[in-house]
UniProtKB/Swiss-Prot annotation:
Protein's job: Exhibits S-adenosyl-L-methionine-dependent methyltransferase activity.
Similarity field: Belongs to the UPF0677 family.
Keyword flag Methyltransferase: yes
Domain of life: Bacteria
EC annotation from Swiss-Prot or TrEMBL: 2.1.1.-
Swiss-Prot/TrEMBL GO biological process terms: methylation
Catalytic EC class: transferase
This protein's UniProt keywords: Methyltransferase, S-adenosyl-L-methionine, Transferase
Residues annotated as binding S-adenosyl-L-methionine: 129, 158-159
Protein name (record): Putative S-adenosyl-L-methionine-dependent methyltransferase MAP_1622c
GO molecular-function term, one example from the UniProt record: methyltransferase activity
Length: 302
């Protein structure tokens, strides 16, 4: 097994669109959501996901969606990301029920929650990501005639820089409680950038605010993923994406950071916990995947 070269395809000022580098991973996850939507008994249906794949023209993902698998192995990653999607959906639903009317989706990518969820009246959903990614999403959804179910505000910004000023300039109210999601981002940040991200979120979060985070206790090791595909032939993880080269070594624990900076952190769960909570019995392949990814699903409040 070769030593993974974490972050070897990254630089401090790298940029991307939806079909390159880190941007492609958002497209890949949209593909998994689309596959989950057509699987038996899906936890959530994101019917916009397949639209993004079609618009991208990506041959790998369009091919997979044209012939979706049905075995436990083939549905492994769609199943795991179905659970993750449901986790964040439930988080925002609960925040809205508690009276929070500002939602901030960090690294929004191809997230369609502004269009899918039933938001309370007067809710604003801020989507923060690179301009090229937001432009692709807006174009595709606009061509579909999709209408958001809340006031949707795009904030074009690099999350490694000071994105708090553009967010406030877009109308974010620092005096009102907010609900934050950080989904699928942390592996692509250095430890320093992760600290800066949470520091900015904390500085913008009024009392009553909430946060939900999806994190990994290990980085996505390309060799481990390849070995998984060999031991479970139906698993097709990545379309040959080298996640090791796009991600960084794990250092800080997000739950520990939040607890040390004024947040009350709920018990941390993993993907298997989420599945059990949704009445599912995780098959062997799911247990194996979470064994090396060491997923963390974190919620906290101020």
């Amino acid at each position: 097994m070769t030593t993974p070269q974490f972050g070897s395809q990254r630089s401090d000022d790298d940029n991307w669109d939806i079909v390159s580098s880190v941007g492609y991973t958002a497209l890949l996850v949209a593909g998994w959501r689309a596959l989950h939507a057509v699987s038996p008994r899906p936890l959530v249906r994101d019917d916009y996901a397949k639209t993004f794949i079609a618009a991208s023209g990506d041959p790998y993902l369009t091919g997979v969606l044209a012939n979706p698998g049905t075995s436990e192995d083939e549905l492994a990653f769609p199943r795991l990301y179905g659970a993750q999607t449901r986790f964040f959906d439930d988080f925002f639903d609960a925040a809205g029920a508690a009276g929070i009317r500002q939602a901030v989706i960090i690294a929004a990518g191809l997230d369609s929650r502004a269009y899918r969820l039933e938001w309370p009246p007067a809710t604003t959903v801020f989507e923060v990501d690179l301009a090229k990614v937001l432009e692709f999403k807006a174009r595709v959804l606009g061509e579909q005639g999709a209408v958001p179910k809340a006031r949707r505000v795009e904030v074009a910004a690099d999350l490694r820089a000071d994105w708090s000023r553009p967010l406030e300039a877009a109308g974010f109210d620092v005096e009102s409680p907010s609900a934050w999601s950080v989904e699928g981002l942390l592996p692509y940040l250095t430890d320093e950038a992760q600290h800066a991200l949470f520091t900015r979120i904390s500085g913008l979060s009024a009392p009553g605010s909430r946060i939900a985070i999806g994190a990994l206790g290990s980085r996505l090791d390309h060799d481990q993923l390849h070995a998984l595909e060999e031991s479970h032939p139906g698993v097709d993880v990545s379309g040959n994406v080298d996640f090791s080269a796009l991600t960084y070594e794990p250092q800080s624990d997000p739950a520990e950071w939040l607890a040390a900076h004024g947040w009350v952190v709920d018990p941390v769960r993993n993907t298997l916990d989420l599945q059990a909570g949704y009445g599912m019995t995780p098959p062997e392949v799911d247990v194996k995947i979470d064994g090396f990814m060491r997923s963390q699903y974190i919620t906290a409040a101020r």
